[in-house]
Amino acid sequence: MTRKLEIPESRDLPDWSHIGGGKVRELYVHRQYKNILLMFASNRVSAFDFVLEPEIPEKGRMLTQMSNWWFRKLPAENHLLENYDQELYRDLASHIPSHILERSTICRKMDIIPFEFVIRGYLTGSAWADYLENNTVYGIKLKGKFRQGDRLPGPIFTPTTKSRTKDTPVRYEDLVNAIGLSHAQQLREMCTDYYTTAEQIARNKGLIIADAKFEFGIAEGKVYLADELLTADSARYWDINSWGQFDLPIERRLDSFDKQAVRDWVKCNSGKNITPQNITPLRLPQELIQTVYKKYKTLLAKLTG
């Protein structure tokens, strides 16, 4: 079955050429300024590298707002055009319909570093699975005993491949071989600093950032934050009060403001193996869509309110 993807009409973006897209976003280049891109965030939802139906209402707008909020909060140079040329940004934005602009990021074109950089501050997800099996977190031995959801002694840098299918962990030594020691050290320091700063900001908002994914690009020899930043799709958020209540069931203590409920539902309804044949016919129930929508909406309000 072929799915119809949500893509803005060409008449709404006459100054832009569509050059590609992924599971949840579409990418455009400006017809005159070839070094300027527009990333459009759709309402599509994916799990296990498959796009599912139906879409989540307002998802693109909410995640774009989260990302832009963090780009302005963190003391980091990033790919946003408005930070580089405000006059050009205002001119380009003025020709984009508001219903598209609110879900779009206008940015400078960069050479994207072909890795994703995950920072883990708490023992959860694949880090917890690794700890249970090997008593390590991606090769790092932890001293003492830890429970699921515990704060780690310090943020752990765990890069992965950047793939259209399944991302796989990358050893630091292999990262050095791929991009050089200087860039590897710089990116590890940047990720650790950005995560530490963001986690403190989030804590002041009543939230915990358990882990987060960062992406970077290079322009004119400098490294910049790129892609989306600390959205509900690229970071794992918990409620700080629930996290601290150890008498609660673990699924309530570590209930995250993201699409984990979608992943759990797919696991339960796709049989033993998560394959295209098993996932494609699935249609997410409306109750689940509303649950995820409310999580995104609550997170956005907590962060920006």
UniProtKB/Swiss-Prot annotation:
Pathway: Purine metabolism; IMP biosynthesis via de novo pathway; 5-amino-1-(5-phospho-D-ribosyl)imidazole-4-carboxamide from 5-amino-1-(5-phospho-D-ribosyl)imidazole-4-carboxylate: step 1/2. CDD domains: SAICAR_synt_Sc (cd01414). InterPro entries: SAICAR_synt/ADE2_N, SAICAR_synthetase_CS. The keyword Transport does not apply. Keywords: ATP-binding, Ligase, Nucleotide-binding, Purine biosynthesis. Its EC number is 6.3.2.6. One of its GO terms (cellular component) is cytoplasm. GO terms for molecular function: ATP binding; phosphoribosylaminoimidazolesuccinocarboxamide synthase activity. The keyword Glycosyltransferase does not apply. GO terms for biological process: 'de novo' IMP biosynthetic process. It catalyses: 5-amino-1-(5-phospho-D-ribosyl)imidazole-4-carboxylate + L-aspartate + ATP = (2S)-2-[5-amino-1-(5-phospho-beta-D-ribosyl)imidazole-4-carboxamido]succinate + ADP + phosphate + 2 H(+). It is an enzyme of class 6 (ligase). Belongs to the SAICAR synthetase family. This is Phosphoribosylaminoimidazole-succinocarboxamide synthase. It comes from Tropheryma whipplei (strain Twist). The lineage of its organism: Bacteria, Bacillati, Actinomycetota, Actinomycetes, Micrococcales.
